[in-house]
Amino acid sequence: MEADEFIPLSEIADSIKCIKLQIDSGDVMGRIREIIIKKKYIYAVDISQQVIFVFNKEGLLVTKLNKKGRGPGEYSRIGPVFIDDDESYIEIVNYTGGKQSILRYKNLSFDYINTTLSYPDISANSVKRHKGLFYFAIQQIDNHINDKDTNGDLVICDSENNFKVLFDKKIK
């Protein structure tokens, strides 16, 4: 399959910058699931070590979030990661094998702030949050939403667990 139309990169970007992420000699980055680039910092979510590395815009390691455990303020397994617009806190979906929760930490010090006990139980390839809504890219992964089986491309969920399925394919 070929693209019908090409868009020159110059139409969507005026420059490109490659930043080499540098870690301390005692650290190793493993399987990076996601790189999140914000105004102040670059975040690398390492799912093999269950750690989030934080880099400055020059690529130097600033700190890392490493609170895997079973105690208060610790996570069992890192799920999706959300960082607020001013980068004052970082939130991690804590996959526990049961009801997922969202742990909130103060950014850079990673002091534990609180836990939200509500996170939709949806299987997805990617999750983003914007203005209180969760956007799940489920891309044909089977889910049961609104009392129906679905494998649509996108599911949107609000803070009261109201769901909307977009591009429902119903592929068997």
Q: Which residues make up each language-model segment?
A:
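Blade/loop signatures of beta-propeller domains
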Residues: 1-18
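Beta-propeller domains
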Residues: 9-10, 44-66
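Beta-propeller fold detector
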Residues: 16-20, 61-69, 112-119, 163-171
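Blade-loop segments of beta-propeller domains
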Residues: 22-27, 31, 60-96, 118-120
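Residue-level detector of Asp-centered blade-edge/turn motifs that repeat once per structural unit
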Residues: 37-39, 83-86, 129-131
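Conserved beta-strand positions in repeat-built beta-propeller and related beta-rich domains
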Residues: 44-48, 92-96, 136-139
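Short, solvent-exposed loop/turn segments at conserved positions within beta-propeller repeat blades
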Residues: 47-48, 95-99, 144-151
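Beta-propeller blade signature
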Residues: 101-108, 149-161
